[in-house]
Amino acid sequence: MYHKSDEHILDNYTFGIFDMYFGNHKICVLDIETTGLSPERSHFILGGLLSFEGNNKARFTQYFAESLSEEKEILERYLEEVGSHDVVVTYNGRNFDIPFLLTRAKKMEINVDNHPYNLDLYLVLNGHSSLRKLLPNLKQKTVESFMGLWAFRTDKISGAESVTLYHEYLLKKEKNEDTSAHRDLLLLHNQDDVLQLSKLFPVLEKTDFHKAMYTLGFPVISGNKKLFVQNITFEKKYIKVSGVQTSLPVDFVSYGTGNDDCKIFFSKKSQTFEFFCPIFQKNDFVILDLLKLPVDLQNVFDEFPNFESGYLVFMSHNDIKYREVNFFIKNFLLKVLEDIL
């Protein structure tokens, strides 16, 4: 196994909406290299990880398999480091990188108890921005060019070429020939993908980020207690929120005796949670009465234009107020984690 770690100086990204969901969380950026697209038949050969350490500093780490027999070793080390973070940023990672890693881990009987929330920039851009209409495609390099980042790339190969390059590397190694040039090209390609992705955060300002988080879900973290919100739905008399417990799962049930009470369910066995909070309709508005909650959240919404006298508007003329809905869910669950569980 070849392991590399070095420090980089990067500008800290700050954006109010981003910080609402991910402020004070331990964030990393990852990209992986494999011998193919199928995790059933292909191998994980290289993982790059950029971990933000504060004060404009970040640590970039790579794990490289010098032979296919080292796959399990680098996968264990890589997943352990990824799992020490709260949020992992990827580009199409929900469709490729993360499922690939988890499938390979399962095949190799590697236990993955703790995994971070995956913020997939591709899914945010594809579903919640106008860039899809403006650009020929949403490949990472295309978006980099649009954001004026292309000049920062130094690698000259594509993902497909990296597969060929790795096979050439293995052949040279079998013949006891010098493999350093091939290895360094692979490492450079992976490094550029990760570092360039870390510079793409400002593209989020061109998205409807609140809507993206409503659709894709978001983390709620208090100390070592972590929840990932996955589904938000409006029913006739309730807003229903469900997701997973990703660390220290617990069993907990809370519900009142009336029809207008909140209901909260946490399952240790399934590592899931869900809660229902009563809502009501007034003309064309869907409203939550904060006074009927088991936790006090009134002061949280003082600056929100859709909050008045203890009432929070969730929907107006079928227009969902994504910021209000998400902010309520996050703060409600934080109160549950901190004051009840």
Describe each region flagged by the PLM:
Residues 1-42, 52-341:
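DEDD superfamily 3′-5′ metal-dependent exonuclease/proofreading module
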